[in-house]
Amino acid sequence: MLSQLAMLQGSLLLVVATMSVAQQTRQEADRGCETLVVQHGHCSYTFLLPKSEPCPPGPEVSRDSNTLQRESLANPLHLGKLPTQQVKQLEQALQNNTQWLKKLERAIKTILRSKLEQVQQQMAQNQTAPMLELGTSLLNQTTAQIRKLTDMEAQLLNQTSRMDAQMPETFLSTNKLENQLLLQRQKLQQLQGQNSALEKRLQALETKQQEELASILSKKAKLLNTLSRQSAALTNIERGLRGVRHNSSLLQDQQHSLRQLLVLLRHLVQERANASAPAFIMAGEQVFQDCAEIQRSGASASGVYTIQVSNATKPRKVFCDLQSSGGRWTLIQRRENGTVNFQRNWKDYKQGFGDPAGEHWLGNEVVHQLTRRAAYSLRVELQDWEGHEAYAQYEHFHLGSENQLYRLSVVGYSGSAGRQSSLVLQNTSFSTLDSDNDHCLCKCAQVMSGGWWFDACGLSNLNGVYYHAPDNKYKMDGIRWHYFKGPSYSLRASRMMIRPLDI
């Protein structure tokens, strides 16, 4: 940029000098000197000559004076025509002009040099402050960059040192992972071996199962053949049973006739007997109304005794518990070993069955006669297969007549056999296999088995099927008491007994 400014200033000075020289030349020309102008390219040369006499006429020349002058200078023939004095003057003028031009050149150079130095000094002074500011800014930026580079170098060194410190741990972790990988590969190989062994065993099992299946199919075919033969035999047996049933119906008719005769005979004997003691009672044997009277008479041992129930044709053997919870209890039901079948009809449950010393049902009619003449309470004792015992006691107990379907009525529950009664308290009729009196279309006596006071199958049934442990669970038709062991647990033992309230 400085060189361009210097060149510009030099050009301006040269123009000024040239204009000054031209002005001087014009002034001298005005003084009476002749001028000679020579044009060479972009340059123009002016020569001052003294005035001379007119030249002799010559050939016609071009109107262009510059061209004429150049040709007169270049052509020696024309110069030869000039007078010698004029030539000398011209040469002298040329020399003077040359010297003057050299002086002018030196002067111009001197002036330009001084002017250039001044301009350079001024420009240097004008640009020193910005350059200093620029240098300071560059220095600050350089310092900041150096600091950043120093920080980055320190961070890099820290990271490098941390990586160097972590290299042993990384190496150990890598070794550990390699060892684990080897162990996993070994385990995988072991599992592959076990898998192949299992596949072989599976193939062997499949082969064995196919063989067993073939054997089962063969046995099935044999069983089907046997079943067809047995079906034919059963058909023959059914035919025989029809004949036996026919004979049995005849025997039942005869038995019914005999029973009627026996009742008539007993009626006749009773009419002739003494009112205080029936004729068929053994001499010396004392008869009581229930076990409470037996205990009041002085008996203290529990066992089988004879009682005379009102409206009964003969005395009944009953089991009296004279020790439990104050005694005086007359047993009306006992289950303890499953020796007696409780899947009975209405008539059996009415008259009673079993042995009073063991499993038995005293009979609905006897219980009705006992509870008809006095107010009784009921006690139910239960035992599970784990040896746990519980009881349920009802303060008032009454059983209706046969016309009332031996309807049950109990009031005042207490005991340890559940938070509430598993026995329906009021107006529940008795049902058996052949007399469905429950409030359900499903015939609970057939589904739950036995005879009981079912109310939509209810929460209890102590006359169900006797199941021995461990087959006593999940049995809906077993000996059940819901609030003691749940709805499907069949109990080990149960007792039902009654006694008068005035005791």
From Swiss-Prot:
Main location: secreted
UniProt-recorded Gene Ontology molecular function terms: receptor tyrosine kinase binding; transmembrane receptor protein tyrosine kinase activator activity
Recorded coiled-coil stretches: 84-238
GO cellular component, one term: collagen-containing extracellular matrix
Localisation: Secreted
Pfam family name, one: ANG-1
Subunit field text: Homodimer; disulfide-linked. Interacts with TEK/TIE2.
Protein name from the UniProt record: Angiopoietin-4
Provenance organism: Homo sapiens
